[in-house]
């Protein structure tokens, strides 16, 4: 039985061998040449399978074919070949009609295995295994030069930067996908066109006018999930890809290079911390501050400790910071002065150790109290008999103790209630505003004011104004009471709402 070598080796000139069986006596030499070429091609494919960029499971679907398109096979229609009609594009037929293909589908490869990758095509820019294996730096440069119909190996052409990853569909007779790639899954991000591109290059904004290629190491779109490969190549190429994906679509949830720039900007920008300590022994009048600048808080604190605060030999612990509110009042101990200076410098050397909190404190006592919010510890119990309330710090307990004592200096003039804080009294006054009848009949209200005038007219600026009065009435009463005549208008009904 004779071999049908037409779909397999059209580049060898044997494409018409199986189509013309009445001339088979004239082609025995071609059969031998085809067998030798098949062995050589198999060796090339095996060497290609060892390439780190290609999965070995895909190698059955590829073969090197620098010649024209092949005829239709069981794996799907190829291109428009010499003897094969124009059929539907095969799963890995990577060449548009009329162009040479670097990879064509094998006739015997099952179509079901190729279906997941049927939407991806690559550039017809690799005409030999050497071009495919060792053309490492360009990636998509060949496709950009060849024209819009060709596609890059790892990056889409310039006209297909915004191709949507979900628009994969079944391709028909002359239709070619735009922006599809040969090896998906390297990085599931879009590369967007940038206004800073110039001749295929991106200005990185770094010293020395460093430029990076935008079409090199371009990020690709793919529905495949290959986290190991994506993470490996991202860590390898992301330093060369800074800022190239700033205009990526918002529905992608990947880490963008902007975070890297923000981190580097925070590390590179120097802070100017100025020492405002005024040396009391200087003879200048007015006295000038130190005004030394430092780039880190550690340098400023070290300078303050060595040059100004001094060691244990200092007997007077006075803060001489410019415009200090203490105005030369000394501290009893050096550590109190050190804690006070942090108010001026902004130093907060005590961070919260709990993960995700991020709070920092200037004093260790405040950190100790704060950590109780994480642990739930409440060591301070109410000292009133019968009360089991507990608190995280003593100040909260002290405020609570006013509930049990008579120390409530803020009295309500509308009733007999008293409060420990003026904010509580203001909140209570809203109750009287919502119930005007109760406020008029309150005994405290009648006893606190003259009977001839309403309670709200005695002190217009107080918080216990009559709620029945409109704002216009209050202003009118204020003007009348502050006038020289001291008489009130006779018609009060005009002031009520």
Curated annotation (Swiss-Prot):
Q: Where is the composition biased (Polar residues)?
A: 97-107, 459-469
* Compositional bias (Gly residues): 66-88
Ranges in a coiled coil? none
Q: Give this protein's Gene Ontology molecular function annotations.
A: chromatin DNA binding; DNA binding; DNA-binding transcription factor activity; DNA-binding transcription factor activity, RNA polymerase II-specific; RNA polymerase II cis-regulatory region sequence-specific DNA binding; zinc ion binding
Which biological processes are named by the entry's GO terms? anterior/posterior pattern specification; cell migration involved in gastrulation; central nervous system development; negative regulation of DNA-templated transcription; negative regulation of neurogenesis; negative regulation of transcription by RNA polymerase II; neural crest cell fate commitment; neural crest formation
Q: List localization entries.
A: Nucleus; Cytoplasm
PROSITE patterns documented for this protein = ZINC_FINGER_C2H2_1 (PS00028), ZINC_FINGER_C2H2_2 (PS50157)
Report C2H2-type zinc finger ranges.
273-308, 317-344, 350-374, 380-404, 410-432
Where is composition skewed (Low complexity) in this entry?
434-452
Q: Which domain of life is it from?
A: Eukaryota
For this protein, the record's PANTHER family field holds: GLIS FAMILY ZINC FINGER 2, TRANSCRIPTIONAL ACTIVATOR CUBITUS INTERRUPTUS
Q: Which family does it belong to?
A: Belongs to the GLI C2H2-type zinc-finger protein family.
The domain-related comment in the record is: The C2H2-type 3, 4 and 5 zinc finger domains are necessary for transcription activation.
UniProt protein name: Zinc finger protein ZIC 2-B
The protein's organism comes out as Xenopus laevis
Organismal lineage: Eukaryota, Metazoa, Chordata, Craniata, Vertebrata
Gene symbol here is: zic2-b
